[in-house]
Amino acid sequence: MRAALKLFSIYALLTGSFAFAQESYDQVFAADVEAPAGFMTNRRSYSAIMAVLNPGRPEVTAAQLEQLKAVPLEVIFSAVGEYRLNYAAGFANTQPGERLVGRALTMRFLPPRPDLSRAANVLAEQGNWDRRYYARAAEEAQPGDVVVAELGGSDGHNLFGDMGATGIQMRGAAGVVIDGGMRDLTGLQDDRFDGFPVLHKFSDPHTTSWLGVEYNAPVRIGGVTVLPGDIVVGDDGGVFFFPPELLETVLEYAATVEKREAFQLQLLNDREYRFRDIYPLAPALQQELGRQQ
């Protein structure tokens, strides 16, 4: 009996008697479609992932970003739950001590090759943008944007020098994060770049040669994923990214922490309670804080 079933299975495979299985498999996939005119040169560089996410991502206001500048990174870290892993360390800051806060304008670069270069030229011509994506940002960045560039990390390549940075700065961008390098370090440390920090992995005199292949699409910075429109908070230690839908939660949490810590400092100055009862607050002191609010 087993031999007969085995022979039938072989016969079915040879004759296509199991065609229904192939039909079922094919039905899993949606039919592909031709891209409409202008699709490849959409100004926001179409990303299927972002097409799913964007409807739920709120607009971020300049006032919210201004509020966020005063929130310590540790407080943000405590408020974002599962997004705590989105911190990338190991960056140098061209403006030591200056904080970087804004919305991510992402771009991804790859080492050059002739066919990739031809494709980049075609898209740049059709879309009427500069194929050098840092130059494109110098024409398209909006106030409050942070250019976030994936450029191969410590083994990668340079994004720009002081002229490219000046163009981006003049658009009102808040700064730049480069998972890679830059040139003109001395120039970028000049006073004219006060308020425009560039977080980077290294600097050397090479000019830019890598090709921009993604603009306003998901990128990898260090070991974390960054999406266009993410909130960027950077300092001398590193840079943190989180989705804009969490921004209001972060600001509300920060206000709560500020009130609690002011209360704790007052208790410490009064010297009426033990430190262990103040930090963290004992239940009775938590109730007192609640009554004061």
Label each PLM-derived region with a short phrase.
Residues 135-180:
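Extracellular/luminal Protease-associated
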Residues 201-279:
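Acidic, glycine-rich flexible loop/linker segments
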